[in-house]
Design a protein with these regions (language model features):
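Active-site substrate-recognition segment that forms the wall
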Residues: 84, 89, 93-233
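Flavin (FAD/FMN) cofactor-binding and adjacent substrate-gating region
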Residues: 1-53, 58-59, 65-76, 218
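General beta-strand structural signal in soluble alpha/beta enzymes
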Residues: 8-12, 58-59, 92, 159, ...
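A structured beta-alpha segment of the ubiquitous adenosine-cofactor-binding alpha/beta core
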Residues: 78-83
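C-terminal lid/capping helical subdomain adjacent to the catalytic/cofactor pocket in oxidative enzymes
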Residues: 220-269
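Active-site catalytic microenvironments for nucleophilic, acid-base chemistry
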Residues: 49, 100, 104, 257, ...
Length: 269
């Protein structure tokens, strides 16, 4: 790695304030390589690459089940019409719906499907000028990264996410993505821990996201799970569980890992 991009501690708050005068802290860790990406443009680019390689995206199409067949799978889908598709591999990267897809895979042991907890995270945007030129992350809170500062490619400053644990029996297809405006006061309190100059009435509701987690409130945070044939014993099947918000950052590494599993089985067979 380029030495200029390595993380380095800022042992005194004065060093951090020289870089970010609005920041209040005791110490900080500088990460020069951290940044932002246009997630929509990234996905559009990846889709174009996939389609150029022969893939097809089928939207508004629900996975309704799969059965093992002749070393591969017959997958059933439902939408305007029902279809059956014969395939060599099923890679379940359905996010919030990954457990539902696994349960609809005939013969897959239910005991191997991990419990899922859903954590809703709110974001509020800032009216006015951005106070920082870098991303700012406070110490993590239970279940999340803490209410951190970020900015989009248009320069809009945002804060979030918080953590709102949803009832464990909430169906993934009945989730509410509205921003709860009454949570704003907690945002003011959290943000003022590292930006005391935040003015009242300067936050506006932005958006929410819901994270599929493999550990619940107060529990030790668990990592992603990539369960392939070596784990569950079924050929041509990979389940990705608990791929929550860091999954976008790790998406290319996850894809490389999944591809290595597919290639390893293909070589053996």
């Amino acid at each position: 790695m380029n030495p200029a991009l390595r993380q380095r501690p800022l042992d005194q708050s004065v060093q951090a304030r020289e870089m970010e005068p609005e920041l209040s802290c005791h110490a900080a860790l500088l990460s020069p390589s951290s940044g932002i990406v246009d997630s929509h443009a990234l996905m559009t680019s990846l889709l174009a690459d996939a389609e150029a390689a022969g893939a097809m995206l089928a939207v508004a199409t629900r996975f309704s089940g799969a059965v093992a067949h002749d070393g591969g799978w017959i997958m059933r889908t439902a939408g305007d019409s029902e279809y059956e598709l014969e395939c060599g591999w099923i890679i379940n990267s359905a996010g919030l719906f990954a457990q539902s897809v696994a349960r609809a895979t005939t013969g897959y042991p239910v005991r191997l499907i991990p419990q899922q907890w859903l954590a809703k995270g709110h974001y509020f945007s800032l009216t006015g000028r951005s106070p920082f030129s870098r991303l700012v992350y406070p110490l993590p809170s239970d279940g999340g990264l803490g209410v951190h500062f970020t900015v989009d490619l248009g320069g809009q400053a945002k804060f979030g996410p918080d953590v709102e644990w949803l009832p464990i029996d909430t169906p993934a297809d009945a989730l509410d993505y509205t921003v709860a405006e009454e949570r704003a006061q907690a945002f003011y309190d959290e943000i003022r821990r590292y930006w005391p100059a935040l003015l009242d009435r300067s936050l506006q509701p932005a958006y929410t996201g819901i994270r599929p987690k493999l550990s619940g409130p107060g529990a030790h945070a668990l990592d992603f799970r990539i369960d392939g044939p070596k784990f569950h014993g079924q050929s041509g099947l990979i389940h990705l569980f608990g791929i929550e918000s860091p999954g976008l950052t790790a998406s290319m590494a996850i894809a490389t890992r999944v591809a290595s599993i597919v290639c390893a089985q293909s070589i053996r067979s």
